[in-house]
């Protein structure tokens, strides 16, 4: 009801203020005093995650992500903001060579559309392709990326990595199909890489009036 919502909002704001002001143990003490029925408020969970991640508390940040891994996109309320924290944590895990954990965190994003969804799917695919050597998983993620972008720079990027993943599986036909798709966008970095994959040693020229593209992921 409205009263409960008001109380939850007030409690959250108090804890959030404490989180923003505190640099050490004040946050944990403040959280401990929150009534049990409010402790799993998704807004508080996000603020705690952001605070821990900002201070490099990797393991406790992971615990919050694991505790909320079954939440839907709707339940997370701002799944796009949760993804920004996830992405930061994923890159820390890659730096530490914890690739399986990085993949788990990247792939459990709960997103279903939008630029953050595309970013998450590409990153999960890249980890699967480059570090886990699991091309089946990589292809699934890269397809999700490829099917959800529209700007040439992003389409070329998706096509190139699909080509590389199919190449690793030995499926040269599918690899060439995607390299050809990527090579249509020669004004992009991945378009040029795609061209080189199917025209080894070949040269290409760009029109003087070619456009500069932005990215949707």
PLM region descriptions:
Residues 2-4, 9-15, 213-217:
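Conserved small/polar residues in nucleotide/adenosyl-binding loops
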Residues 12, 24-27, 38-48, 55, ...:
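Generic helix N-cap/helix-start motif at coil->alpha-helix transitions
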Residues 16-17, 49, 90, 125-126, ...:
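Conserved small-residue packing positions in alpha-helical repeats and bundles
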Residues 32-40, 68-79, 107-116, 144-152, ...:
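Solenoid-like repeat scaffolds
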Residues 55, 96, 131-132, 169:
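Structural motif corresponding to the intra-repeat A-B loop/turn of tetratricopeptide repeats
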Residues 173-190, 199:
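TPR/TPR-like (Sel1-like) alpha-helical repeat modules
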């Amino acid at each position: 009801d409205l009263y409960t919502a008001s109380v939850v909002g007030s409690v959250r704001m108090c804890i959030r203020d404490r989180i923003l002001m505190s640099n050490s143990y004040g946050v944990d003490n403040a959280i401990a005093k929150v009534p049990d029925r409010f402790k799993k408020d998704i807004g508080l969970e996000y603020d705690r995650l952001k605070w821990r991640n900002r201070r490099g508390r990797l393991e406790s940040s992971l615990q919050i992500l694991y505790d909320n891994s079954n939440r839907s996109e709707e339940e997370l309320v701002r799944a796009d903001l949760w993804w920004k924290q996830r992405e930061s944590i994923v890159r820390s895990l890659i730096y530490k060579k914890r690739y399986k954990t990085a993949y788990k965190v990247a792939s459990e994003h709960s997103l279903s559309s939008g630029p953050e969804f595309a970013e998450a799917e590409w990153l999960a695919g890249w980890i699967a392709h480059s570090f886990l050597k699991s091309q089946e998983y990589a292809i699934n993620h890269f397809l999700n990326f490829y099917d959800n972008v529209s700007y040439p720079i992003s389409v070329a990027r998706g096509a190139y990595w699909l080509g590389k993943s199919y190449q690793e599986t030995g499926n040269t036909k599918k690899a060439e199909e995607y390299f050809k798709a990527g090579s249509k966008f020669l004004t992009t970095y991945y378009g040029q890489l795609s061209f080189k994959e199917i025209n080894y040693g070949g040269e290409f020229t760009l029109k003087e009036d070619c456009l500069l593209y932005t990215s949707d992921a």
